[in-house]
Amino acid sequence: MNLKKKYGNYELHPQMKITGYENEIWDEKKEIIEELKRAVQEKQKEKKTCILSFDLYPGVRKEEIMELANALQPDRIFDIEDCAKDEETLLREFNDYITDDRVFGIMCHKTIDTWFESEKLETMKKAIETERAEEKDTNGGLIVIVGTATELLAEADVLVYCDLTRWEVQLRYRSGMPNWHSTNYNDPILTKYKRGFFIEWRLADRYKKERYEKFTYLLDTETENAPVLTTGNAFRGALQQLAGQPFRMEPYFDPGVWGGQWMKENFGLDASKENFAWSFDGVPEENSLNLEIGGKVLKVPAQDLVFYAPHELLGERVHGRFGAEFPIRFDLLDTMGGQNLSLQVHPLTEYIYEKFGMPYTQDESYYLLDADEDEETYVYLGLKEGVDKKEMGRELCAAEKGEELFPAEKYVNKIPVKKHDHVLIPAGTVHCSGKNTMVLEISATPYIFTFKLWDWGRLGMDGLPRPIHLDHGMKSIQWNRDTKWVYDNIVGQTRTLEKTENCEVERTGLHSREFIDTIRYTLSGPHTVSMDDTVHVMNLVEGRSARIESMDGSFAPFTVHYAETAIVPAAVGTYRIVPEEGEMIKMLVASVG
């Protein structure tokens, strides 16, 4: 393997500077408590007893919040989770969404009040009303409510929303944290993640996004025992600011059984780790935003921006089609010095909707950010001519049982690829990235729905066989996508749209079944891009760095370094890509076609 280190300027912890709220953030517990006491005292001037709520996203460590609650010296603390249904009842009532599959559940469309016993809620509501009605001394009273969905009990005078990113929730699952109101500490990570993905995060997000305007404060609980508090006004203002300028999210990295060495070498990752397989740098549903306010950093889920400012972020055309959901996903797959990914397929739209309740599917593409130059590199893509469906199914079943190895090259095309090639993978196409490649994967966001057909006879990082879904997979394969179809439709489809001395604009992707359009800009000078009422997601696939500049000065020049993913909200309208002086760059930009 020939692994060449590039520029070494990838930012692992990008911070987005927010202006205008420098005095509305606190990162010391003592300061946080003092600020909350000040807010309570202001409310006590209006009414004798104040209600302050700490409303928790599932996964927030309640013991840390109770420490803050007790420091406020309230007259009484109410925990809404005392009103929750017991674990057995919750499992029974949500069993249809959990299913008995190791990986897949069904998207839950219930609301968060279904987690609680209505009679217990009513009893606690009355207790709060009674406590509030009691005469207090001249300083006024204080009731604190703690837990998930506190607004089901009472509308707070001071509402402190305690936020947390999905990635941090997953890390806590790995360290032993159970699901919400559960005791499944030792369950497999896949089990916990499934309940989070299909149930808990859906209900919690549905509840949260209706209440942004009510937040008096936002509490960042990402780092253990290091909370950061900002005002609701500053939090909302920060999101509005980002909705009108380019931004990056904080990437995260994870090892995998097939993982490689490219990211470790080029991004300066932990050298003690065996490998890194994935980088998620463009997934708002899981990535975080680092908001730098007055020299302090507030970490919040990027999904908050999607929920709070969907029109500005996505554009009217995209919002009209997808609602408050970010439809484009960028991630990196590193097999440099690693192994093949699993052989897999994604379901068609009707299948994913009927089986899992998802409104659209995971069409995707592989852009070759880099590839080993010393040996042949390839992707497995589509079926060979004349494949016998029954025979292939029989051999896959035998391989799943461990009776034989699946002869992938007997059935699946092995397509040679090189750096900067772009192959399209509409749902229903069998595919797999080969070893010694660095892939920028561009896909629609229902990313959990990958049906593995064959995993090369290996075990996962947990020492267990990785889940195979032959039943779903065989029903999803489009058997007409053979060698000829592959070369006619999804390989070598790049077309030049514009070419001048300093600029070449190429469409590298947009199969007729896919909604994500990809344009590659090869530039040695400034180039203006019009957005057509859609969010843009971009990655600098060649070159040290480039600037994204405003056409009217509405935002400061924004630098994107090699291999970084950045997002330009639709509200920007038009922007300019500017290479470093004397350098040729390639910027790949995805949008909704």
Q: What residue ranges belong to the model's regions?
A:
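Transition-metal
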Residues: E35-A39, Y212-K390, D455-T496, N502-E504, ...
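Loop-centered beta-sheet repeat module
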Residues: G402-W456
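Ligand-binding loop in jelly-roll beta-barrel domains
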Residues: E325, T335-N340, P347-T349, D372-D374, ...
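NTP-dependent small-molecule kinase module
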Residues: N2-E46, E64-Q73, S175-P178, G196-Q261
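ATP-dependent small-molecule kinase phosphotransfer cores
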Residues: N2-D27, E31, D75-G141
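ATP-dependent NMP and nucleoside kinases share a basic, alpha-helical "lid"
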Residues: I128-S182
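Double-stranded beta-helix
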Residues: Y380-P407, I442-R481, E581-G593
